[in-house]
Amino acid sequence: MFEIGFWELVLVAIIGIVVVGPKRLPEVVRTLGLLLRKMRRTISSVRADIERELDLEEMRKLMSDVDEPLKKHVDQLNQSIWQAEYDLRQGGKNLLKMIDEPPYQEPPPAAHSVQTDAEAYRDTGIEPADKSSSPEHHHDDAAR
């Protein structure tokens, strides 16, 4: 981490002896060692947190890339379901209307009535002859 060579360590030791004194130097070195270890742990912890955050950020980006098409498909499915539900409701309403309406009944067939000769002639537009002028009638009158 600190790429310190042999001569740099000798220089730091000489400065430490001059500043702190030979009696307190081992205690100061021990304290510096503890501080360096704590600093290294903190730095590695921060580094791990940053890497974890970067991984999380990548995962979020990946999820958002997957999420958009998935949302579109879900919206299309919802639209299809809503349309099917609407169609079913309309079909149900039409079915209920058909059930509520009376069924179509054909009008009863016209009664076949026997037409009299006069009615039949009237329908044709020809008038019947008098009974008195018919030959059968004359024959019956003469016989009497």
From Swiss-Prot:
The chain crosses the membrane at residues 1-21. It comes from the Bacteria. One of its GO terms (cellular component) is TAT protein transport complex. GO terms for biological process: protein transport by the Tat complex. The keyword Protein transport applies. Residues 97-144 are annotated as: Disordered. It is found in: Cell inner membrane. It holds the Pfam family TatA_B_E. GO terms for molecular function: protein transmembrane transporter activity. HAMAP family: TatB. Part of the twin-arginine translocation (Tat) system that transports large folded proteins containing a characteristic twin-arginine motif in their signal peptide across membranes. Together with TatC, TatB is part of a receptor directly interacting with Tat signal peptides. TatB may form an oligomeric binding site that transiently accommodates folded Tat precursor proteins before their translocation. This is Sec-independent protein translocase protein TatB. It comes from Dichelobacter nodosus (strain VCS1703A). The lineage of its organism: Bacteria, Pseudomonadati, Pseudomonadota, Gammaproteobacteria, Cardiobacteriales.
